[in-house]
Amino acid sequence: MVAIVGFLMIIVIVFLLLRGLMSPIVVLAMIPSIAALILGYDPVTIGGFIKKGVETTMGNGILFIFSVIYFGILSDTGFFDVIVNFLVKKAGNNVIAITVATAVVATIAHLDGTTAATVLITVPSFYPVYKKMNISPKILLCLTGGCMGVMNLLPWGGPTARAATVLEMDATTLWHMLIPLQIIGLIINFVLAVLLGMLAVKQGAGMGKGVEDEVDEKATAEAEALRKPAPYLVFNLILTVALIGILASGIVSSYIVFMIGLCIILAVNYPNQKLQDKLIKKNAPAALIISATLFAAGAMVGIFEGTGMLTAMAQALMSIIPAPLGRYIHVIFGILALPLGLCVGTDAYFYGIMPLVMKVGETYGVASLSTALTMIIGKN
């Protein structure tokens, strides 16, 4: 009975998230609660499960709030625009330099971990250049996507934070295990940028009129008013590098790093209290939605474990999975991660499928951490 309710709950969660019928926050908190009620647990007990689960996500949720607002304000200062314009000008009419610059910008732009910001910074800036230089826009999308996949492994990136929530561990601790792979991924992306640039030259790129000296977006008056001069941008660069360095060292909790970092960047760049409030309100919605989703996922994980649904489902799957295959279940799902993620969506993949695969893997001697790392890497 417990396993059946668990499987039905997973199916409903995946269906609702895949069809976009409800907000992930509602789905992840409400559906498991209903499943627990069906299993006979009273509201007080369910509340205890939820409390325990949410407590494990607290650090990661707070990290998201401060990191997303920090990078949003960093973007408001014109930090990313300056980097884009500088690299485009330096690349000139050199096709390979343009593709490498694309990879650099996409990598830096995805420091905030949000897809929308990366695409809005990278694609509009480089698409006119690609068009004039007769470079296939597929290369632009390929490089942007590749760099986003690698940078998604940052602790405030969606996949790492979601997996850390399921593992009930700090996202920064999980990221430390992924740093070597992330470095290799960045190197591969830049090598790929060079190779795609060479391929574009063979296909006739660079035969256009060339890029113009000025590649500037038509920014609104409000955005222009927020832009800061060079000395501030240098300070912002040093601050950001310092924050990431402290995170990599692991000497301070990640959310504390960004909490202090946010205070510093606001105090230095925008010392006016009203303007500070305005910028926080501007960037807060995205941060709060992500954090609320993490807390809701924590509620789901708490109910999963408290009711024993996860264990019951794993035992049911063990009865139909051949033992020799079970030892490699993490590898199998690592290979299937990309198409599976595309089919069911990110939240359903990490909060619906990953916990079950981890539990099944445990019964065959595969550590949950190994399964999670494999599924994160495969997904990105």
Predicted regions and their residues:
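Structural signature of hydrophobic alpha-helical transmembrane segments
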Residues: 1-6, 58-66, 114-119, 180-183, ...
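Structural signal for alpha-helical transmembrane segments and their membrane-water exit/capping regions
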Residues: 1-4, 12-45, 67-78, 232, ...
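Interfacial loop-to-helix junctions that mark the boundaries of transmembrane helices
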Residues: 1-2, 19, 49-59, 171-180, ...
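Hydrophobic alpha-helical transmembrane segments
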Residues: 3-8, 26-29, 61, 96-101, ...
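Long, contiguous bundles of hydrophobic transmembrane helices that form the permeation core
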Residues: 4-7, 39, 176-279
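Membrane-embedded alpha-helical segments of multi-pass transporters/permeases
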Residues: 14, 36-40, 111, 190-194, ...
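Membrane-embedded alpha-helical segments and adjacent helix-loop junctions characteristic
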Residues: 43-131, 274-362
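Membrane-core helix-loop-helix motifs of multi-pass transport proteins
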Residues: 128-215, 221-227, 366-380
